[in-house]
């Protein structure tokens, strides 16, 4: 009798496994797609000095995930920024054609219609809008006409506010560095514990500082609330118009003409003819404009390599004596104390990189940055040219910009030696340029969800069919074995 029971165990086990498998296969599942094709997005960063085009890419089925958008290609538009075409708006649109033609080559043809195309203009156009709203509208109209002629999904050309520029730069940096969320080795999304880092951007006409803060801002205009992946962020941000690299240089030039009749920040042995109209045509130098002057006149100006006088000239850009709040950065703007790590990009990066690679000077501390700036400012024109043969365009201005950066960080934003150790100067993160453009596109295309992505598990249809057949075969095999056991038990020779 015991032998009969033992002989029934194998077919019963097979039947149990088969039935369990069939029951599991009947549980509702999610469809799992095959490896997806790529989607693309294009952003034109219309800055004050030039326009850059960025083409981004991501898996087509990851519209609401993260850690997957990267830079596919980029293109620098020849010529100045679109605001420089205020007197001939049609040229603003024409200037974009070469890079847009590259976009046609970089994006697969079958993806043209689904590729969003954005143009965002920053401080250069904000300045133009202050002096000539009519010219601003015509420039935007001209670039819109050009962009709509291309087969992409054009979604508008607009002027970003300073707050937008700061916040989107902060989003870009933290997104690329996976500070919001990352895909862990266990196969699911996790929230890193390292926290976010602040972002500092130095453009041509404005500079922005943005960082997460725990306390409410005393000035509501400087506070932004974001909800990303189920996490709330209170962010401080401020944009200083007229404190971008190019506008700072214009303001220093106007001050040098007014105070010295020579330029202490320029290297000794360098001189040039300065057209007064170009110095005073910007809204940023309007307060320094003489009551009467010949706009078509030119003035010869020479450099003196005087670091001390250059420092005094730059210091005049910052008003740190007046503050209507409990604490300020400069010009009466509220700012909480800087804390945590920061990434500084754009002209911050290029200037500090010059000090490190061309001048061969350390810049790891505020004191080293100050010393490197002073060393650069004391160089003659011949000494600078010997270091970078053939480079003429930006070489005379590295002293002034480096001096401005040191003053901005130490006197303006109130970094000390301890907090400065958390500042890194970078051009890219995860092989993607750091700036507002990616954050802008992520926001407008809803590629960053407000809540944490859900975890889905599914089975490919072909695998599901194979398992169904396997478990069916197991059940049939079990039935065959049971029938054989029963017949064997009923046979005359069975015990």
UniProtKB/Swiss-Prot annotation:
Induction: By dioxin. GO terms for molecular function: ATP binding; nucleoside diphosphate phosphatase activity; ribonucleoside triphosphate phosphatase activity. PROSITE patterns: GDA1_CD39_NTPASE (PS01238). Its cofactor is Ca(2+); Mg(2+). Residues 1-4, 484-495 are cytoplasmic. This is Ectonucleoside triphosphate diphosphohydrolase 2. The lineage of its organism: Eukaryota, Metazoa, Chordata, Craniata, Vertebrata. Residues 26-462 are extracellular. ATP binds at residues 204-208. Its EC number is 3.6.1.-. InterPro entries: GDA1_CD39_NTPase (IPR000407). Keywords: ATP-binding, Calcium, Cell membrane, Disulfide bond, Glycoprotein, Hydrolase, Magnesium, Membrane, Nucleotide-binding, Transmembrane, Transmembrane helix. It comes from Mus musculus (Mouse). The active site is at residue 165. Belongs to the GDA1/CD39 NTPase family. The chain crosses the membrane at residues 5-25, 463-483. One of its GO terms (biological process) is platelet activation.
